[in-house]
């Protein structure tokens, strides 16, 4: 019995010392600080012990060089990277791109070797100047949305050249190499058009897969934002609109499992029902739901706004085939994630030997704990616990 206790104690000690093999990456969006008071979220609100990587969204591009979007971003950079004083194991990445940024600046930049080198060298200078540990390329998307087919190849060329430049800079200056990651699409047709997966997997440190935004009001019927599995009603291409199918596609087409980071949304998509008596998956809809009080975006509610919707009397339903919830009240309907679905997805992630999770975005979790009455950052904290994320040197505020 004494030997068993000793062995168990050593195992626990080793686990604490070695830490988790999983990554927990968290996006911070620069516009979160501009929300009304209770929803305003600044870099100083971030628990430095919560995530392994913090990703600042977004930088811009001018004349093929990376640049900040607003002058306030520079103060944010300092505050975000200052969190590393409290957690020496924390890494910070700067994301460039995003949906609103569009593909055009990327297409122009990758079009010639000279433009690519201008961009790559500007990235190295910029990241070092502002104390970031790496880059997140968020090109949405190579080969889609007006980006020409040749960009599929040129994106791989860019990534390969950037990785080489990062390695050379590291050797030349005898400093840790900058990390290189990319956001990856979650729609199969977009993946096919945009990515040479084996080549990207070889050059990138991680691929953060957008396993969310899989259904929205443009569909004309209700659907989950980020279902783990397909619905019995999913046929044709709809059968691929789930986390399991998307990640399987990336793996089956050449991505290393340990480099795949699964997207976890801290928000839901909202719909207006055509008929309030029809509330299930696939029910007909007429438009996006009204904007949330704090996020102020039609068709979307932050997790903490979903909690308010539930607290005000909405009916919550567990969608068992897809392992995620939805809720409705009157003619309003929302598909989202909660602590239960995050736990199930975290276990699935571990069962599939994947690299970790990425939360989009941290500022839509219930960071204050005052809306959902669970705890601070209930969704992200669930992932931290279930993926065994910890830093022995970090002392957080919660």
Swiss-Prot record:
Keywords: Carbohydrate metabolism, Chitin-binding, Cytoplasm, Disulfide bond, Endoplasmic reticulum, Glycosidase, Hydrolase, Inflammatory response, Lectin, Nucleus, Polysaccharide degradation, Secreted, Signal. This is Chitinase-like protein 3. One of its GO terms (cellular component) is extracellular region. GO terms for molecular function: beta-N-acetylhexosaminidase activity; carbohydrate binding; chitin binding. Optimum pH is 4.5-5.0. Expressed in peritoneal cavity macrophages and in peritoneal and bone marrow-derived neutrophils. Abundantly expressed in bone marrow, with moderate levels detected in gastric antrum, spleen and in alveolar macrophages in lung. Not detected in brain, heart, liver, kidney, stomach, intestine, skeletal muscle, ovary, testis, thymus and lymph nodes (at protein level). Detected at low levels in bone marrow, spleen, thymus and lung. Barely detectable in intestine, kidney and coecum. Disulfide bonds join 26-51, 49-394, 307-372. Residues 22-390 form the GH18 domain. It catalyses: Hydrolysis of terminal non-reducing N-acetyl-D-hexosamine residues in N-acetyl-beta-D-hexosaminides. It is found in: Secreted; Rough endoplasmic reticulum lumen; Nucleus envelope; Cytoplasm. Chitin binds at residues 70-71, 97-100, 141, 210-213, 360. Its EC number is 3.2.1.52. Pfam families: Glyco_hydro_18. Lectin that binds saccharides with a free amino group, such as glucosamine or galactosamine. Binding to oligomeric saccharides is much stronger than binding to mono- or disaccharides. Also binds chitin and heparin. Has weak hexosaminidase activity but no chitinase activity. Has chemotactic activity for T-lymphocytes, bone marrow cells and eosinophils. May play a role in inflammation and allergy. InterPro entries: Chitinase_II/V-like_cat (IPR011583), Chitinase_insertion_sf (IPR029070), Glyco_hydro18_cat (IPR001223), Glycoside_hydrolase_SF (IPR017853), Glycosyl_Hydrlase_18 (IPR050314). Induction: Up-regulated in response to IL3 and IL4, during the inflammatory response and upon parasitic infection. Residues 1-21 form the signal peptide. It is an enzyme of class 3 (hydrolase). Belongs to the glycosyl hydrolase 18 family. Chitinase class II subfamily. GO terms for biological process: inflammatory response; polysaccharide catabolic process; response to nematode; response to selenium ion.
């Amino acid at each position: 019995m004494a030997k068993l206790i000793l062995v168990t104690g050593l195992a626990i000690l080793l686990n604490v010392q070695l830490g988790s093999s999983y990554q927990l990456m968290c996006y911070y969006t620069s516009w979160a600080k501009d929300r009304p008071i209770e929803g305003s979220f600044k870099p100083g609100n971030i628990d430095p012990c919560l995530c392994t990587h913090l990703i600042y969204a977004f930088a811009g591009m001018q004349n093929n060089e990376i640049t900040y979007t607003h002058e306030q971003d520079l103060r944010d950079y300092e505050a975000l990277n200052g969190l590393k004083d409290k957690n020496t194991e924390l890494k910070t990445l700067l994301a460039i791109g995003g949906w609103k940024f569009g593909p055009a600046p990327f297409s122009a930049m990758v079009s010639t070797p000279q433009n690519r080198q201008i961009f790559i060298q500007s990235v190295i200078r910029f990241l070092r100047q502002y104390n970031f540990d790496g880059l997140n390329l968020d090109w949405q998307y190579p080969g889609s949305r007006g980006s020409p087919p040749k960009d599929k190849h040129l994106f791989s060329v860019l990534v390969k050249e950037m990785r080489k430049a990062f390695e050379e800079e590291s050797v030349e200056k005898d400093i840790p190499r900058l990390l290189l990651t990319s956001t990856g699409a979650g729609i199969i047709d977009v993946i096919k058009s945009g990515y040479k997966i084996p080549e990207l997997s070889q050059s990138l440190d991680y691929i953060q897969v957008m396993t969310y935004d899989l259904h929205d009001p443009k569909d004309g019927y209700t659907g989950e934002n980020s279902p783990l599995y397909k619905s019995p009603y999913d046929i044709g291409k709809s059968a691929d609109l789930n986390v399991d199918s998307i990640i399987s596609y990336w793996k089956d087409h050449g991505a290393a499992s340990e480099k795949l980071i699964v997207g976890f949304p801290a928000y839901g998509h909202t719909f207006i029902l055509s008929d309030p008596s029809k509330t299930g998956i696939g029910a007909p809809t007429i438009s996006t739901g009204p904007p949330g009080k704090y996020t102020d975006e039609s068709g979307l509610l932050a997790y903490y706004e979903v909690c308010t919707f539930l607290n005000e009397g909405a009916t919550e339903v567990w969608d068992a085939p897809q392992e995620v919830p939805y809720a409705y009240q009157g003619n309003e309907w929302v598909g989202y994630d909660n602590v239960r679905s995050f736990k199930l997805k975290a276990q699935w992630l571990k069962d599939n030997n994947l690299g970790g999770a990425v939360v989009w975005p941290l500022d839509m979790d219930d960071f204050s704990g005052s809306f959902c009455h669970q705890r601070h950052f209930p969704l992200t904290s669930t992932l931290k616990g279930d993926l065994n994320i910890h830093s022995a040197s970090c002392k957080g505020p919660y």
